[in-house]
């Protein structure tokens, strides 16, 4: 999706949400570049037509609508409180998006209502870093409903990004630990935290340990989605470094297929 095309698609998407009564506009404006980049990368190597899409953590349906506009039959999963919003229900009705409410993804009861082998693509974008529970039950359901020819699309921050969490020399030097800061832990609601950020190698291992059926087809370090924000000399230098050294780029884009469905999700939580 080149710049001119991306602008046209955004304008069309914006019109759709205006007609539906609005949306979370700041979130859409901040994240559309990511939505577009994710779909562009998926489309770049896609060999089949549009099919059934499952958008997990769909929020205000921005990605669900974007894909529905391209012919996908979207099913969206999110918290009940989100799907009670009138404009969310309106835009869902306009695009025949099925809404599945699920309060706790550790117990993915909403996914149990979907037939096996019924989904062609699963969007799991900017979700995995927020998970606070053992996800085995969730992945078992995703494995069950994803067709053998389907694709799981995962995007998440890169732990080793140049501007990322791995590089905290001041915290290390002052004995203030790593990971979440205490200010973030205590001062923000549960679902806003990045409880666990991953490196590319970690995510490759993650899906290998889940099931021998999962096949990592793409494992990419993605550049900054909105480079136009970095206009200072320092900002431009950061962009140049990230361009030259892919491992320091801020984002990961994974596409995971299924070799077959002989093994299932073999990981088993235990004390």
Task: Annotate each language-model stretch with its function.
Residues 30-50:
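Conserved alpha-helix/loop element of class I SAM-dependent methyltransferases that forms part
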Residues 81-83:
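Helix N-cap at the beta1-alpha1 junction of Rossmann-like dinucleotide-binding domains, i.e.
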Residues 49-59:
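Conserved class I S-adenosyl-L-methionine
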Residues 60-72:
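Conserved SAM-binding loop of SAM-dependent methyltransferases across substrates and taxa
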Residues 2-33, 79, 90-95, 101-110, ...:
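S-adenosyl-L-methionine-dependent methyltransferase catalytic module, highlighting the catalytic core
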Residues 109-122:
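A short acidic, Gly/Pro-enriched loop at the edge of an enzyme's catalytic core
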Residues 121-133:
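A short SAM/SAH-binding and catalytic strip from SAM-dependent methyltransferases
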Residues 73-78:
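Conserved SAM-binding motif I beta-strand of class I
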